[in-house]
Every structure is written in structure tokens, then in C-alpha cells.
Design a protein with these regions (language model features):
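Glycine-rich anion/phosphate-binding loops
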Residues: 11-23, 46-56
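Conserved glycine-rich "GG(E/T)P / GGGxP" loop and the immediately following alpha-helix
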Residues: 11-12, 17, 81-89
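Vicinal oxygen chelate
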Residues: 12, 39, 148-150
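Histidine-acidic metal/acid-base catalytic patches
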Residues: 21-24, 30-31, 58, 83, ...
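Active-site groove signature of glycoside hydrolases
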Residues: 26-47, 67-79, 177
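Active-site cleft segment of glycoside hydrolase catalytic domains centered on the general acid/base Glu
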Residues: 44-57, 64, 82-88
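Active-site region of glycoside hydrolase catalytic domains
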Residues: 66, 70, 98-101
Length: 201
């Protein structure tokens, strides 16, 4: 994973050389993509942040293609490409515009379902992302509690049935990652069962 800032050092902007390094490491390790987060809303005007990120990403697209490593944008709570303090019926159009601006199959979405259940309907985001949706992050979220919770727990109000329907509609066949706390074999077995319930019903 790679943000548009150096991991662990939010005072330093990431440049194309950082992305190049991540692409090469992902390829060497047998990975299938590099995750990026497009800036922080507090860094300045969104348009300027987006343009800086776009310019750096464009420099490494030929390398991404040659290595077979897509650059995947994740939706996080970074006050970018959504309205952080507004109601939940928001759409993914700004993410789509950013991805489409590259006109490249090597830029897509790493859609975090739990992150933006607070802000929009997952079924609509998935349908609109369509082929752009390359990978998924899975975690539970409670709108009522305004907090992350265990996947498919009693408090998790993510509409997983609608998520499954939308993923089937777009023919999603990519990786899904449980972005939750780990643990021993028992804990990981529980997480696996939670993911199966979320994605298979």
C-alpha cells in the first residue's frame, strides 16, 4: 500500500520515484497492484492536490503496465473526493472522474466498502465503478454508532445483500481484503467466516 505521502511521515510528499519503488516491490513479491490514497484535504485545494497526484502517477504508468501492476485508488476518510461533514447520500463521481482522467486500464479503484458506507450506498458505488473496481477492502461499520464494528456483527448495518448483488452485476472477480485487526488462528478463522457471510451470504 502507498499513500500520496511517505508512509509514517505525513510531512513529506510522495513522488513518482516512491511509486516506482512500490511497483517494483509489488512485482518482485508477486503482488497484483499498488494502493494509493490521493492526498489529505488539509493540504490545500482539492483540485491542486488531485493534479499533483495525477502528474506523479502519469510518470509511472508505463512501468505499471510493463510490470502488470495496476495503481489502485482507495476511498478513505481523508476529506478528498467526498464531503466529510455532509449527509450519506453521496456518490463516487469524483473518484470515477479521477480514475478515468488517466485513460488507462492500469488505474482503478480499491473500494473500501466500510469506509464510505457512512457517506453513500455501496450498491450504487459498485455499479458506478463497474470495471474500475479492481479490489475490495472489507470491514463492518455502524451508521447508528458511527463506528467500525466486526464484519456482519449485530452492530454492522452495511447492506451486504445489496453489496453481493451489485458485485455480481459488474462481474467482480478480484481480491477482497479484510481490513481488520488480526490475531491468532482462531481470530483469523472468525474473520474468514465473517467475510464469507458478507460476500456469500
Amino acid at each position: 500500500r502507498r499513500h500520496t505521502r511517505l508512509q509514517g511521515d505525513w510531512s513529506s510528499d510522495v513522488c513518482s520515484s516512491d511509486l516506482e519503488h512500490c511497483l517494483r516491490v509489488a512485482h518482485a513479491a508477486g503482488g497484483s497492484g499498488v494502493l494509493i490514497v490521493v492526498g489529505q484535504g488539509g493540504d490545500g485545494p482539492e483540485a491542486e492536490i488531485v493534479e499533483r497526484c495525477r502528474n506523479e502517477m502519469k510518470k509511472v504508468l508505463p512501468l505499471a503496465a510493463s510490470l502488470g501492476q495496476p495503481i489502485l485508488v482507495e476511498n478513505v476518510w481523508n476529506r478528498m473526493m467526498y464531503d466529510h461533514d455532509k449527509p450519506p447520500e453521496q456518490g463516487p463521481e469524483r473518484f470515477i472522474d479521477f480514475v478515468d482522467s488517466f485513460k488507462s486500464p492500469w488505474v482503478g479503484m480499491y473500494y473500501d466498502i466500510g469506509n464510505h458506507w457512512k457517506y453513500g450506498q455501496p450498491k450504487e458505488w459498485i455499479r458506478k465503478f463497474g470495471h474500475r473496481c479492481v479490489k475490495l477492502d472489507i470491514k463492518g461499520f455502524s451508521r447508528k454508532k458511527d463506528a467500525f464494528v466486526d464484519i456482519t456483527s449485530a452492530d454492522d448495518d452495511v447492506p451486504w445483500g445489496e453489496v453481493r448483488e451489485a458485485l455480481a452485476e459488474i462481474g467482480f472477480a478480484g481480491w477482497a481484503t479484510a481490513e481488520v485487526g488480526g490475531g491468532d488462528v482462531a481470530r483469523l478463522t472468525t474473520v474468514r467466516k465473517q467475510m464469507e457471510k458478507a460476500l456469500y451470504g
